Amino acid sequence: MELDSLNTKPLRILISNDDGVHAQGIHALADELRSIAEVIIVAPDRNRSGASNSLTLEQPLRVSEIAPNTYSVQGTPTDCVHFALNELMKDDLPDLVLSGINHGANLGDDVLYSGTVAAAMEGHFLGVQAIAFSLVGKRHFESAAKIARQLVEQHLAAPIPTNRLLNVNVPDLPLESLGEIEVTRLGARHHAENMIKQKDPRGHDIYWLGPPGKEQDAGEGTDFYAIEHGRVSITPLQVDLTAHESLRAMDSWLKEEK
């Protein structure tokens, strides 16, 4: 379906990320979608990986249009989507908010730290269907972009049947080598490894975060398992973090006689 063939209002897509406005992944995604949609990029001016849902509260956001429909923001991924939906596009909201393509996986507990997922989550917060895309590597961005287009076109033909944020991870493989798309749940990792202690040139202690923990819950049905077997993982996420199954137990605990 080409944009010029549409007789109705053209599809509008907002794209953001956490790797920065100049990252390869975001432009692979935008280039793939421009033939079926009007694409507006609003992304951080630099890499903001791991920013999660943070907002900039104590300084202004500086925004520059660095190319037609491409905006660089001195802020976090959440800032970018918040600005786009509440200011830049407030009079003509996009039909979709897409985030990515991230340079690396966002599997299991990663979603709690991910700026990629957070950008999509902000779109969801503000009432727009949102999808986060991540490539489990840094080579085959065209594969992830093709998967993104496939899902967008499927959404146009039959809207996504859930009011949830979607988290999509794509194996770093050529398109023809990818397995099917599998609906998954989040897996889980072991705790991250220890901090790495070093000395700076002046002899002061400095610390680096250790590598992420190995997969702890990576069995069949998880996002880790799908990726390990060459399949695209798509996980519906909800913002409500309430442990609903624990409400009754907590209520009983509070009412126990001391």
UniProtKB/Swiss-Prot annotation:
It catalyses: a ribonucleoside 5'-phosphate + H2O = a ribonucleoside + phosphate. GO terms for cellular component: cytoplasm. It is an enzyme of class 3 (hydrolase). Its EC number is 3.1.3.5. Keywords: Cytoplasm, Hydrolase, Metal-binding, Nucleotide-binding. Its cofactor is a divalent metal cation. One of its GO terms (molecular function) is metal ion binding. Binds 1 divalent metal cation per subunit. It is found in: Cytoplasm. A divalent metal cation binds at D18, D19, S49, N102. HAMAP family: SurE. Nucleotidase that shows phosphatase activity on nucleoside 5'-monophosphates. Belongs to the SurE nucleotidase family. This is 5'-nucleotidase SurE. It comes from Vibrio parahaemolyticus serotype O3:K6 (strain RIMD 2210633). The gene is surE.
